[in-house]
Amino acid sequence: MKLFILAVGHKMPGWIASGFDEYAKRMPPELRIELREIKPELRSGGRSAESVMAAERQKIDAALPKGARIVALDERGRDWTTMQLAQALPGWQQDGRDVAFVIGGADGLDPELKARADLLLRISSMTLPHGMVRVLLAEQLYRAWSITQNHPYHRA
């Protein structure tokens, strides 16, 4: 099984890439994290947020690994603790399907994609920069894995 983070947005600051890479490289070979950046749609010419999200959904769909479990990050998603994420990981691994975490663009995720998702998950009740979400998600995935392995990284 592989973990994918599909993120609408590109040209992130260097510290975002460094932070993401730090946690991604810590993951074990059997649970690698791959980042797939989706170029955002331009909001020009009077385009509505709905049309922008629909166009971004098409790009996300093209980048989704076939048969992957879709975890859409959304402010109205379920509010999991790190322990709940750690409890989900072994089941996902046994299932054998790749897991794709999807981070939307400035307008969020298209409702059709959210309706298809296996899980709607909220990273925080606070509004966060999209680049920061990549780093936080990678760290939480590493922390969840470390919990499943009784690794000393997580000290609760």
UniProtKB/Swiss-Prot annotation:
Q: What keywords would UniProt list here?
A: Cytoplasm, Methyltransferase, rRNA processing, S-adenosyl-L-methionine, Transferase
**Compartmental location:** Cytoplasm
Chief place where the protein resides: cytoplasm
Name the positions where S-adenosyl-L-methionine binds. 73, 104, 123-128
One GO term in the molecular function aspect is:
rRNA (pseudouridine-N3-)-methyltransferase activity
Which cellular component appears as one GO term in the record?
Answer: cytoplasm
Name the InterPro entries on file: Alpha/beta_knot_MTases, RlmH-like, tRNA_m1G_MTases_N
| Catalytic class of the enzyme | transferase
**Ribonucleoprotein listed as a keyword:** no
| Alphabetical list of Gene3D superfamilies matching this protein | 3.40.1280.10
Quaternary state and interactors: Homodimer.
Q: Which family does it belong to?
A: Belongs to the RNA methyltransferase RlmH family.
Protein purpose: Specifically methylates the pseudouridine at position 1915 (m3Psi1915) in 23S rRNA.
Q: Which PANTHER family match?
A: METHYLTRANSFERASE, RIBOSOMAL RNA LARGE SUBUNIT METHYLTRANSFERASE H
The molecule here is called Ribosomal RNA large subunit methyltransferase H
